[in-house]
UniProtKB/Swiss-Prot annotation:
Belongs to the peptidase M48B family. Its cofactor is Zn(2+). Keywords: Cell membrane, Hydrolase, Membrane, Metal-binding, Metalloprotease, Protease, Transmembrane, Transmembrane helix, Zinc. GO terms for cellular component: plasma membrane. Signal peptide: none annotated. PANTHER family: PROTEASE HTPX (PTHR43221:SF1). The keyword Signal does not apply. The gene is htpX. It is found in: Cell membrane. Its EC number is 3.4.24.-. This is Protease HtpX homolog. It is a multi-pass membrane protein. It comes from Ligilactobacillus salivarius (strain UCC118) (Lactobacillus salivarius). Gene3D superfamilies: Metalloproteases ('zincins'), catalytic domain.
């Protein structure tokens, strides 16, 4: 059951990322067709903008993310239990020992960041160190090390870059429509097929960012499920993570979390969510616990 869940989550990730790439290409083609006379030109622009965004976002260092969340790097002597748990999980997961940070916040939570295992770091709040026992803390750190092991931060960066490209292209298309752009020859000659294509292009430009946001959140939720399953693979003890998630779900919102980093945490640090869950960064904790109980 455990390995089936891991394989299923990986397949879903491939599908979501493929959908992202298709959507970015579709919006680029729509922009090109509607306002430049060539769908291929729009696709080329989408590719170039996507590469630029990716390099910019990947260039954001671990230290910047930690600073945004008011996290302080620690040594083994400052928090020996946390340090040794992270060290053990990294060893079992066969990844380099990540840097360890602590956030001074009473709400229990944790996150991992870094573009690859060689430049990764984990952060835990003071609240999680105070409220969780060793078994529960092992479950949480196994979850975070799994994000590092699965290259989730890099994957989320790619998704963010693609979502940013889609938003950028959609804004460009909306501005072109606002200022009266478009293929005047198609509008004037009244060709029904060309008019329909133009309308579909405009519809794609308008709905593209919404679809991209939904896909980005779906990817984030899927990677949380995968990290949960991978954590159990490391600890062989789903109950530790189950108990930790229950405690985290009953806690107050964080005070020192950066909103742009919310998707990185093991649970939403602000506790709010959309009623449909389509725009949530994390799956409902009850569903995560249910999956863990059936492993």
């Amino acid at each position: 059951m455990l390995y089936q869940q891991i394989a299923k989550n990986k397949r879903k990730t491939v599908l979501v990322m493929a959908g992202f790439v298709f959507l970015a290409g579709l919006i680029g083609a729509a922009i090109g067709y509607a306002f430049m006379g060539s769908a291929q030109t729009g696709i080329i622009i989408a590719v170039v903008v996507g590469i630029v965004y990716m390099f910019v976002i990947l260039g954001q260092s671990t230290d910047v993310v930690m600073s945004m969340n008011n996290a302080q790097e620690i040594t083994e002597q400052q928090a020996p239990e946390l340090w040794h748990i992270v060290e053990d999980m990294a060893m079992v997961g066969k990844v380099p020992m990540p840097r360890v940070f602590i956030i001074d916040d009473p709400s229990p939570n944790a996150f991992a960041t870094g573009p690859d295992p060689e430049h990764a770091a984990v952060a835990a709040t003071t609240g999680i160190l105070q409220r969780l026992n060793r078994e529960e803390l092992e479950g949480v750190m196994a979850h975070e090390v799994s994000h590092i092991r699965n290259y989730d931060i890099r994957l989320q960066t790619y998704a963010l870059a693609l979502a940013s490209v889609i938003s950028f292209l959609a804004n460009m298309g909306m501005n072109a429509m606002w200022w009266g752009g478009g293929r005047r020859d198609d509008r004037d000659n009244g060709n029904a097929g060309q008019v329909i294509m133009l309308l579909l292009s405009v519809l794609a430009i308008i709905l593209g960012p919404l679809a991209a946001s939904m896909a980005q959140m779906a990817l984030s939720r899927n990677r949380e499920y995968l990290a949960d399953a991978s954590a159990v693979e490391l600890t062989r003890n789903p109950q530790g993570l189950i108990n930790a998630l229950r405690k985290i779900s009953m806690s107050e919102p964080m005070q020192n979390a950066d909103p742009s980093s919310a998707s990185m945490y093991i649970a939403n640090p602000f506790k709010d969510g959309s009623w449909t869950h389509l725009f949530d960064t994390h799956p409902p904790i009850e569903k995560r616990i249910d999956r863990l109980e059936h492993m």
